[in-house]
């Protein structure tokens, strides 16, 4: 596997830390050891997160190509767009963000707090759009790029989740390399890795990275899209492309994509009672915050699997905490009583 041939612009502090979730493990019976790899604190750029890791492999193209404006898209409380705004500010570039109405959630402050607030503070041109949630290339994003060109700028396109970019999966191939180095220091290997999966490139890159040591099917994606067939197809496509790019040496097949669809309901961006319980439980036992859109659902999935005995006794499970905590502010009504 060859990742070193790709240019990388450092945006993170270095390897994100792996920390034990001792109290949560004990609360769930102590038969499974839970750990978290903290992508939620991987960078000093506006709270960082998984997209910051991905952007390290996209940014060199933007710099080398003389682009002056980063153009991206997400929901109103998109973590992606906040991280793109931060990177644009860091590089001295302009930033245009399309924020679509991906979540059927009504709150008076939803479009004024959290991620979107930070993007505005960092100087991004934020454009609200009424289109609902879906996976793939969006007309509103294409129009934003045309607008930049018409005004004399040179737009660099960054798709939702970085996932449609050919290099979107590379950052999480590197994540797997980091884990292997950290496992040497820890003195053991993780039996399973749990990760939230929506637009696909985080899961796909991780799958390819762990396929290098035979653990592709030990990467358990927790669907939060509520459009699992689209997510599954996207993960497979991105993983197959990424495997070729890094010269993995074997083909990625549909059997390599493990996607648990039990926890995404009722729909994208809306938490269920299990999501909220998982958010509170992890916060109160570990002081680790997760959000209602992504990490709360993957945390719910991991907790539920431990409770159900789905991990063999003695398993060491790594939870990939991808970030997303700023979105909590947009869901304050749900937590008005804690």
From Swiss-Prot:
Known role: Catalyzes a cyclopropane ring-opening reaction, the irreversible conversion of 1-aminocyclopropane-1-carboxylate (ACC) to ammonia and alpha-ketobutyrate. Allows growth on ACC as a nitrogen source.
Gene name per UniProt: acdS
UniProt cross-references to InterPro entries, sorted A to Z: ACCD_DCysDesulf, ACP_carboxylate_deaminase, ACP_carboxylate_deaminase_bac, TrpB-like_PALP, TrpB-like_PALP_sf
Gene Ontology biological process terms, A to Z: 1-aminocyclopropane-1-carboxylate metabolic process; amine catabolic process
Subunit structure: Homotrimer.
List of catalytic residues: 78 (nucleophile)
Family: Belongs to the ACC deaminase/D-cysteine desulfhydrase family.
Keywords: Hydrolase, Pyridoxal phosphate
CDD domains registered for this protein in UniProt: ACCD (cd06449)
Keyword Hydrolase among UniProt keywords: yes
GO molecular function terms attached to this record: 1-aminocyclopropane-1-carboxylate deaminase activity; D-cysteine desulfhydrase activity; pyridoxal phosphate binding
Origin organism lineage: Bacteria, Pseudomonadati, Pseudomonadota, Gammaproteobacteria, Pseudomonadales
Protein name according to UniProt: 1-aminocyclopropane-1-carboxylate deaminase
Top-rank taxon: Bacteria
EC number: 3.5.99.7
One Pfam family per UniProt: PALP
Catalyzed reactions: 1-aminocyclopropane-1-carboxylate + H2O = 2-oxobutanoate + NH4(+)
Residues found modified as N6-(pyridoxal phosphate)lysine: 51
Cofactor(s), by name: pyridoxal 5'-phosphate
Keyword Mitochondrion: no
